[in-house]
């Protein structure tokens, strides 16, 4: 539940390495009170107060994706494709999907199926290297040049459904402790899938930790996740002292 509430509060935010998220100069500062009220309402009521109607689907820019979906630039030697039930189900996820290219790149980046889909993708480019990528939805086709697609650091331009934290007793390595859950859906076939993208970033860990700390100080709401992250942070061998909150109040 704490993770769900945290994700709800983060939907309005864009991670930044330089600008404090809730600084007075921040675009999001004026939304802070509404965001806090919505999350507090969700903790006390069965009917949460939402800032945006839930029936409105996200609006995507087809030419802008997050860096999570950027396919590898180095091609691997083509090998056989394993046609499994999951692979066939993924084809139904792609068929006539309005977000066909975004879904394809997500499947290529999926740690569990990337080898198969990367073979498929590289094989297609080997056969037709000059046409780029062509997507077809209900006989309406469009060509893309991968090098002209814009990849941004804001992960929330994609349909992020949640975050996972794998906090273990082993603090010698920070590898793959954060995972982004990407929700894929094909309204044409009704097929859905959630893909977990591991993301190894201490900067992102600090950003989320500070967002939670600020929210706790501002509202008094307790988070088990915050306690676990602070406990984990204090055990990291390369942290000489507990960092102070990075987000300014003024």
Swiss-Prot record:
Cystine bridges: 136-141
InterPro entries referenced in this protein's UniProt entry, alphabetically: Cytomegalo_gL
Keywords per UniProt: Disulfide bond, Fusion of virus membrane with host cell membrane, Fusion of virus membrane with host membrane, Glycoprotein, Host cell membrane, Host Golgi apparatus, Host membrane, Membrane, Signal, Viral envelope protein, Viral penetration into host cytoplasm, Virion, Virus entry into host cell
Signal peptide boundaries: 1-18
gL betaherpesvirus-type domain sequence ranges: 31-239
Protein's cellular compartments: Virion membrane; Host cell membrane; Host Golgi apparatus, Host trans-Golgi network
Biological processes annotated in GO: fusion of virus membrane with host plasma membrane; symbiont entry into host cell
Cellular component annotations (GO), alphabetically ordered: host cell Golgi apparatus; host cell plasma membrane; membrane; viral envelope; virion membrane
Topology relative to the membrane: Peripheral membrane protein
One Pfam family here: Cytomega_gL
Family, as annotated: Belongs to the herpesviridae glycoprotein L (gL) family. Betaherpesvirinae gL subfamily.
Subunit structure of this chain's protein: Interacts with glycoprotein H (gH); this interaction is necessary for the correct processing and cell surface expression of gH. Part of a gH-gL-gO complex.
Database matches in HAMAP family: HSV_GL_betahv
Function: The heterodimer glycoprotein H-glycoprotein L is required for the fusion of viral and plasma membranes leading to virus entry into the host cell. Acts as a functional inhibitor of gH and maintains gH in an inhibited form. Upon binding to host integrins, gL dissociates from gH leading to activation of the viral fusion glycoproteins gB and gH.
Protein name: Envelope glycoprotein L
Protein encoded by which gene: gL
């Amino acid at each position: 539940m704490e993770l769900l509430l945290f994700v709800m509060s983060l939907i309005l935010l864009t991670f930044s390495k330089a600008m404090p998220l809730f600084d007075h100069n921040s675009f999001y500062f004026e939304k802070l009170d509404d965001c806090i009220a919505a999350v507090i309402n969700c903790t006390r009521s069965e009917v949460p107060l939402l800032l945006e109607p839930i029936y409105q689907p996200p609006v995507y820019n087809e030419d802008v994706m997050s860096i999570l979906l950027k396919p590898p630039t180095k091609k691997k030697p083509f090998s056989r494709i394993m046609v499994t039930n999951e692979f066939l189900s993924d084809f139904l996820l792609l068929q006539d999907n309005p977000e066909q290219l975004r879904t394809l790149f997500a499947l290529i980046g999926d740690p569990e199926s990337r080898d198969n889909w990367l073979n498929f993708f590289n094989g297609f480019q080997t056969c037709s290297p000059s046409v780029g990528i062509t997507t077809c939805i209900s006989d309406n086709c469009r060509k893309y040049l991968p090098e002209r697609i814009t990849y941004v650091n804001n992960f929330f331009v994609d349909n992020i459904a949640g975050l996972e934290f794998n906090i273990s007793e082993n603090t010698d390595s920070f590898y793959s402790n954060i995972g982004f859950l990407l929700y894929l859906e094909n309204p044409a076939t009704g097929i859905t899938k959630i893909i977990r993208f591991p993301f190894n970033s201490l900067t992102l860990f600090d950003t989320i930790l500070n967002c939670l700390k600020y929210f706790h100080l501002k509202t008094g709401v307790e988070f088990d996740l915050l306690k676990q992250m602070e406990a984990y942070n204090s055990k990291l061998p390369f942290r000489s002292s507990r960092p102070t909150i990075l987000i300014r109040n003024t």
